[in-house]
Amino acid sequence: MKIIEGNLTAQGLKVGLVIGRFNSFIVDSLVKGAIDTIVRHGGSEDNIEQVLVPGAFEIPIVAQKMAASGKYDAIVALGAVIRGGTPHFDYVAGECVKGIGQVALNSGVPVSFGVLTVDTIDQAIERAGTKAGNKGEECTLAAIETANVLKQI
């Protein structure tokens, strides 16, 4: 029986980061975590391309264009949506996650979900590098591993 399993080697991988700028005081830490993770796992900053968009809602359409370009082995979506007093959070977060999932399925390029969807600023801070780790790092590891699995299939 053959078992296909990915590894965490980023050497030679071309990774696109699509970054929602809204809540940049949080997102900047996610981006740093993503870049550090790629480099720590043998990747090169020369093989990383950052594409900045206004916010989380715009991430899926840009990720779709990036995936269709054929330039990337993996795409990492990074952003932060923090709940406020209106239903706006639900619409933005829901459409973002749905759109990112569709891009991955339709393109065959792994698109890792590193968009924080949290109730409070404290929760966002925790997930951007303090108590709960850095979700930018975690989703980048998932993107690296998935890209390596797909290369074997």
Swiss-Prot record:
Gene Ontology cellular component list: cytosol; riboflavin synthase complex
Keywords: Riboflavin biosynthesis, Transferase
Catalysed transformations (reactions): (2S)-2-hydroxy-3-oxobutyl phosphate + 5-amino-6-(D-ribitylamino)uracil = 6,7-dimethyl-8-(1-D-ribityl)lumazine + phosphate + 2 H2O + H(+)
The organism's place on the tree of life at top rank: Bacteria
EC number of this enzyme: 2.5.1.78
Molecular function as annotated in GO: 6,7-dimethyl-8-ribityllumazine synthase activity
Binding site for 5-amino-6-(D-ribitylamino)uracil: 22, 56-58, 80-82, 113
Active-site residues per Swiss-Prot or TrEMBL entry: 88 (proton donor)
First-level EC class: transferase
InterPro entries: LS (IPR034964), LS/RS (IPR002180), LS/RS_sf (IPR036467)
Subunit and partners: Forms an icosahedral capsid composed of 60 subunits, arranged as a dodecamer of pentamers.
Database matches in PANTHER family: 6,7-DIMETHYL-8-RIBITYLLUMAZINE SYNTHASE, 6,7-DIMETHYL-8-RIBITYLLUMAZINE SYNTHASE DMRL SYNTHASE LUMAZINE SYNTHASE
Name of the protein described by the UniProt record: 6,7-dimethyl-8-ribityllumazine synthase
Organism: Hydrogenovibrio crunogenus (strain DSM 25203 / XCL-2)
